[in-house]
Amino acid sequence: MSRRRAIQPSPALRIGPIELASPVVLAPMAGVTNVAFRALCRQLEQSKVGTVSGLYVCEMVTARALIERHPVTMHMTTFSADESPRSLQLYTVDPDTTYAAARMIAGEGLADHIDMNFGCPVPKVTKRGGGAALPFKRRLFGQIVAAAVRATEGTDIPVTVKFRIGIDDAHHTHLDAGRIAEAEGAAAVALHARTAAQRYSGTADWEQIARLKQHVRTIPVLGNGDIYDAGDALAMMSTTGCDGVVIGRGCLGRPWLFAELSAAFTGSPAPTPPTLGEVADIIRRHGTLLAAHFGEDKGMRDIRKHIAWYLHGFPAGSALRRALAMVKTFDELDCLLDRLDGTVPFPDSATGARGRQGSPARVALPDGWLTDPDDCRVPEGADAMGSGG
């Protein structure tokens, strides 16, 4: 399937009552899409193209930890005062816990949108039957989606579901998952076009997004995988017919990508890529936001991984990179960034894949997991394993 074909600017995306000016969603990413990163993405979109047009999703929290009101989890659900719509992703394996968490979100006004994660390929999650392993148990999957939808009845909070193609090439689940989610009242579905066995390696199979779009007719289908620039997003929508795109690793170290996407989808002029000096200022702003959220010590520890992504493809020198990777205070960060050559233009080598990729691997599953897809027993220990955020 060709990935480069011009299309006209896309219309807005509607997810339940939520209407977006561009069909773009920030994928929830653990340790990344906290309130600081989301605020930075929105601020850059506003400053560069004058819009805040997409949906920016909070990093995943576990349903069990949420209803237990674990302090770390509650802190993870922080939203900016001007953030709208507020979008929260739940990791969940139990219909009862799902219902309680969704009722809590709705009753306490914690968010305006609930997404559910059935796409995590991490072995410690799948070996207990959670994440990307769970949609194989189609009855249990349906009960979980139905519980969240039932808990939000009478509110304006839409429930959406994100999943992968399946466990591996021999066990595709995405068409059943899409059909079930649609039937149980989900407002949209999103497909990461890789199997759990692929993890983040190889190439996303956009053909499976097209198949899901043909299979799910009454709600939006969003595509995720291998979108690193606006051209990729336009190509995915053109070639698959999907209704929107979900941006994950492509925005790591490039939070201005959402401004570029907004411009592409609205037909506006593309913003000029930042120079190294402008990237340094963005890092400073990111560090300020992280320090406000976590405190300076943790905020500076958190910014370290982002700096490696920000400087990808730029000339910085190994000594300066090492110093930035150990930064402890904002003043130190500020001084080190002053040593960069601010006149360096954005290099072509700074685009493309970034973040974790790894290699494909056999998916860790509970014993006997693949025996009966209609077994609706809650996997033992999977709900509690993530308690604490």
UniProtKB/Swiss-Prot annotation:
| Record's subunit section | Co-immunoprecipitates with DarG in the presence and absence of darT.
Locate the residues binding FMN. Answer: 28-30, 89, 162, 224-226, 248-249
> What does the organism's lineage look like at the top?
Bacteria, Bacillati, Actinomycetota, Actinomycetes, Mycobacteriales
Record gene name: dus
| Cofactor requirements of the protein | FMN
- Species this protein is from: Mycobacterium tuberculosis (strain ATCC 25618 / H37Rv)
Recorded GO terms, molecular function?
flavin adenine dinucleotide binding; tRNA binding; tRNA dihydrouridine synthase activity
Q: Does the keyword Transferase apply?
A: no
The answer to whether UniProt assigns keyword Oxidoreductase to this entry is yes
Catalyzed reactions: a 5,6-dihydrouridine in tRNA + NAD(+) = a uridine in tRNA + NADH + H(+); a 5,6-dihydrouridine in tRNA + NADP(+) = a uridine in tRNA + NADPH + H(+)
- What does it do? Catalyzes the synthesis of 5,6-dihydrouridine (D), a modified base found in the D-loop of most tRNAs, via the reduction of the C5-C6 double bond in target uridines.
Please provide the record's keywords in A-Z order: Flavoprotein, FMN, NADP, Oxidoreductase, RNA-binding, tRNA processing, tRNA-binding
**Stored CDD domains:** DUS_like_FMN (cd02801)
Protein's name according to its UniProt entry: Probable tRNA-dihydrouridine synthase
Active-site positions, per UniProt?
120
Q: Tell me the Gene3D superfamilies matching this sequence.
A: Aldolase class I, Putative flavin oxidoreducatase, domain 2
